From Swiss-Prot:
Keywords: Cytoplasm, Membrane, Protein transport, Transport. GO terms for cellular component: cytosol; endosome; retromer complex. It comes from the Eukaryota. It is a peripheral membrane protein. It comes from Danio rerio (Zebrafish). Its main location: cytoplasm. This is Vacuolar protein sorting-associated protein 26B-like. One of its GO terms (biological process) is retrograde transport, endosome to Golgi. Probable component of the retromer complex, a complex required to retrieve lysosomal enzyme receptors (IGF2R and M6PR) from endosomes to the trans-Golgi network. InterPro entries: Arrestin-like_C, Vps26-related. Pfam families: Vps26. It is found in: Cytoplasm; Membrane. The keyword Membrane applies. Belongs to the VPS26 family.
Length: 329
């Protein structure tokens, strides 16, 4: 037994008051695994009990005080020595003294501000946790408990469609259109692709969802691109005037809301990447940023029904672009 552990010690346990009824959410850990954590939202109260159990009954524990903290923290993996705290709340549970028997302490952090979504990425981690500490002269006794925070949004007032023309002069000219520029995490991307000029032999076409994580500032900026999904649009050569519909369901993919300049430390953005491959394996692509957001748990119609309604509205809203193009000549 080491000198520092000689004498009385204690175990700490943190229990939330609503642990039996509060929902849990899966969240990815640094090693890529998934664990379930208690789920909270911005403004919710965090309350519970701290149980301090003496390891050796009958022996007193000298301490410099008990406290519990609620912390929101950003950790950049390339700068692990520095933790950037954007929320830091402290409650003192006991003054310095001696503890003769195991005790339980109540705590409550009322209407806690939780401005950002929990996130574990390639180069950064944003976490919220409770930390209970028994302060001692030589070595403190600590226990941490992580929670997960989701940020909810309302339906955006402005949500215009995305419409662009891309091509190679005298070789390829296409127009693509997506029904919206902002999607919730269980939404359906509905769109169309029109081939106005095809003079190269296209053999494959797909849409990729790309997640781009940006960390750091100034000269210390790191970018990580991750392909979340690949959606095959066609396999074979298109012809002039052909129109190909797109229906891409987002619910099956692991994504977070778009996160822009979080505490001036990192961003997470999403892009639709339109990719064409010709018979000589040359790749042509065009990226377009989209905004993702998380909606609350409200009653929704089935995703297939949503897709059908969105498709009907989208297809019936305008004359087909190839025809409109010909009419303008």
């Amino acid at each position: 037994m080491s000198f520092f552990s000689f004498g009385q010690s204690a175990e700490i346990d943190i229990v939330l008051n609503d642990a039996e009824t509060r929902k849990k959410a899966e969240h990815k850990t640094e090693d890529g695994k998934k664990d379930k954590y208690f789920l909270f939202y911005d403004g919710e109260t965090v309350s519970g009990k701290v149980n301090v159990t003496l390891k050796t009954p009958g022996k007193r524990l000298e301490h410099q005080g008990f406290k519990i903290e609620f912390i929101g923290q950003i950790e950049l993996y390339y700068d692990r020595g520095n933790h950037h705290e954007f929320v830091s709340l402290v409650k003192d549970l006991a003054r310095p003294g001696e503890m003769a028997q195991s005790q339980t302490f109540d705590f409550e952090f009322t209407h806690v501000e939780k401005p950002y979504e929990s996130y574990t990425g390639q180069n950064v981690k944003l976490r919220y946790f409770l930390r209970a500490t028994v302060s001692r002269r030589l070595n403190d006794i600590c226990k941490e408990m992580d929670i997960v925070v989701h940020t909810l949004s309302t339906y955006p007032e402005l949500n215009s469609s995305i419409k662009m023309e891309v091509g190679i002069e005298d070789c390829l000219h296409i127009e693509f259109e997506y029904n919206k520029s902002k999607y919730h995490l269980k939404d359906v991307i509905v769109g169309k692709i029109y081939f106005l000029l095809v003079r190269i032999k296209i053999k494959h076409m797909e849409i990729d969802i790309i997640k781009r994580e940006t960390t750091g500032t100034g000269p210390n900026v790191y970018h990580e691109n991750d392909t979340i999904a690949k959606y095959e649009i066609m396999d074979g050569a298109p012809v002039r005037g052909e129109s190909i519909p797109i229906r891409l369901f987002l619910a099956g993919y692991e994504m977070t809301p778009t996160m822009r300049d979080i505490n001036k430390k990192f961003s997470v953005r999403y892009y639709l990447n339109l990719v064409l491959i010709d018979e000589e394996e040359r790749r042509y692509f065009k990226q377009q940023e989209i905004t993702l957001w998380r909606e609350g748990d409200v009653a929704r119609k089935s995703m297939s029904h949503q897709a059908a309604i969105a498709s009907q509205r989208f297809e019936g809203s305008e004359k087909t672009l190839p025809q409109a193009k010909e009419d303008s000549n």
